[in-house]
């Protein structure tokens, strides 16, 4: 088991631990490059809030954007398969366009018969306990499998019998036929008075798809609005309205966020949609019309709590706060940060999301190879991957620590500075910026973060490995 986790560690961390020059795979450095490039920054410090093991990654729903999906036909293979990754859902104060992949319907409004052959035809009443009913009719197209219904038969017709039950797995609508020695579902008031369910996808009966596949999906978020128009919604709805297996994928930087099955449509005793607490969603880069039901939107993925403050060195007393990136503010592309003064470029958000999505994919793929639980283990490894990248950036000297922030320097050419000596020289500006009562403590914090001993670097390998794997040891027992 230990060897498997070692493989997982190596596959998730392709950057050589002993190299201070190769930072392309470090998420903190990548985030800084994207922010600097997307906002044309130079001569400034980008300070990130630290991400710890307890941090998580989440997505925001987006609005007011154009999106070109990739469409294909046939059974999804390879990268087009739908492998879920559960993510946290940021609360949104704004309504966003969502789409019901399959429309909901009120089951109690349907009159349906469930015909079964009885195994004991010479009885006055023919009960149909589970295992003694022979299903004879096929299901009406588009209806989901209902729950257990009371079943009985008598010469006078169908009556409720709460002691004998059959699983009503098939539905059809033969109102003109009598039971004729067959057990039929009671047509009266059900034990559950009413419920709302999603129809099954159009291509769910495809012969080559595994029969054990369970439809995926549920309601997504209170922020969803089915009436808000969006080009991707009409395209996806039209494409999935077919009995031929079809799939659709988002472009890089975007993901589908779909409601999990733990979120429930209204049912008897709960007249409103119920959502999980804390809110979660299933992340997909591709979905299909074979197994996906419920509500979906398009979103951007990012680590929870990643905050960015930019200190402009050309204006010593000015602090430009760019705010939280992809974290909890429920913002849409182009929305002005609530603290004012700055609007994110959509390319910046999209590139940040793409970078995090790549990390999430590598996590998910590695977990899949180990045949472990994606929802539980992938989240743990993902959180530790981000925390480890921040640790490496700090101890490797690429970022300077001020209070609870890890600061990356953007040089005159707009590139992320990776030369430790130049970083040390420029950090004097942060000392001057912080002149006042707390200047000494800030300066000491900065100096303490910059490495001065080369012997410390080789220790990063064992420390990083222990940091990544320590929360996973109980799983190997």
Swiss-Prot record:
<feature type="transmembrane region" description="Helical">
    <location>
        <begin position="322"/>
        <end position="342"/>
    </location>
</feature>
<comment type="similarity">
    <text>Belongs to the gamma type-C retroviral envelope protein family.</text>
</comment>
<keyword id="KW-0812">Transmembrane</keyword>
<protein>
    <recommendedName>
        <fullName>Endogenous retrovirus group V member 1 Env polyprotein</fullName>
    </recommendedName>
</protein>
<feature type="signal peptide">
    <location>
        <begin position="1"/>
        <end position="21"/>
    </location>
</feature>
<keyword id="KW-0814">Transposable element</keyword>
<keyword id="KW-0325">Glycoprotein</keyword>
<feature type="glycosylation site" description="N-linked (GlcNAc...) asparagine">
    <location>
        <position position="68"/>
    </location>
</feature>
<keyword id="KW-1133">Transmembrane helix</keyword>
<keyword id="KW-0732">Signal</keyword>
<feature type="topological domain" description="Extracellular">
    <location>
        <begin position="22"/>
        <end position="321"/>
    </location>
</feature>
<dbReference type="Pfam" id="PF00429">
    <property type="entry name" value="TLV_coat"/>
</dbReference>
<keyword id="KW-0472">Membrane</keyword>
<keyword id="KW-0895">ERV</keyword>
<feature type="topological domain" description="Cytoplasmic">
    <location>
        <begin position="343"/>
        <end position="477"/>
    </location>
</feature>
<dbReference type="InterPro" id="IPR018154">
    <property type="entry name" value="TLV/ENV_coat_polyprotein"/>
</dbReference>
<dbReference type="GO" id="GO:0016020">
    <property type="term" value="C:membrane"/>
</dbReference>
